[in-house]
Amino acid sequence: VFAASTTKERSFLVTVMILLLLLLTACGNAEKKNGADVQNAGVNEAANASAGASFPRTIKHAKGETLLQTKPQKIVVTYFPYADHLYAIGEESVVSGVVGLQSLRNFPVYDAYTKEGGAKDLGSEANIEKLLDLKPDVIIGWGEDAKIYDELSKIAPTVLIPESENWQDTIGKVAEVIGEEDKAQQYVKDYNDKLLKLAGKFEQTGVKGKTAIFMMTWGKGFNYYGGVRMEPYYKGLGFAKFDGMKDWGEISLEGVGAVDPDYIFLGKDFTGKAEMTLKELEKSAVWNSLTAVKTGKLFIIDTEIVGPLAMGQMKGLEVMESIMQKL
């Protein structure tokens, strides 16, 4: 129609020919679109059918075995990192309620999943009445729920998955509950492939082997992180730890000055309780004497990248990649 309206001054014959051409093209495009829609619908239906075909299934877990007759459509999660796992593999629609949802609200990467109208915030501890109100198909719990397992099981089939500092240990077990192990495996593969590729860039630019500290303001000093959750950055990318680094610890400003790392990654204080602030640090002679501060190797980060969560650590690699481009 647009093509025809722009050719009003042309001869009637040419106009008719153009209209016929447009009609034929539109028909062809419609056929292609319809074909693509049918194909996409077929793929989606096949994926859903594949997941559904894997039920009934028996899930072995920390408290024995749980039989699931059909794929769960409404899940309550009593340990918020397991909600992260479901979000990571694109299964947010099954997350009905989350104990500790407020913790995810502290981190920007989860903004799309924690807004009003999404999963219900069930508070900081598992509350039987709140869980009953949601009428879940399945409850996914963690080690701490062993003491209330019988109560939870009366509400819905319950699967207990022991927590881990390494999300790759648990994401597959969470995905197994809904028959989507393949999605979890793909997410892990994508992450590890990205980590390996980025590690190569670190080596090429000479960053590998440089000392780094990942920390967050806490009280009058800092918390730093160096355990399993940080292995992608140290063992994977090749940052070096300072001597005596623990899995987790508190460190003073003077302590940071003593180790004087090449790189500092400072997480934002999501608690709002730290007495030490970045503005105060900028006035400190000790802070300004640090190698990382003087050489522009201080980076302010969202704290989720130092956590044990799948989406947070995927974001961590994206942050590192962005930083690499600035070096």
Language model features by range: what are they?
Residues 151-216, 306, 310-327:
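Extracytoplasmic substrate-binding proteins
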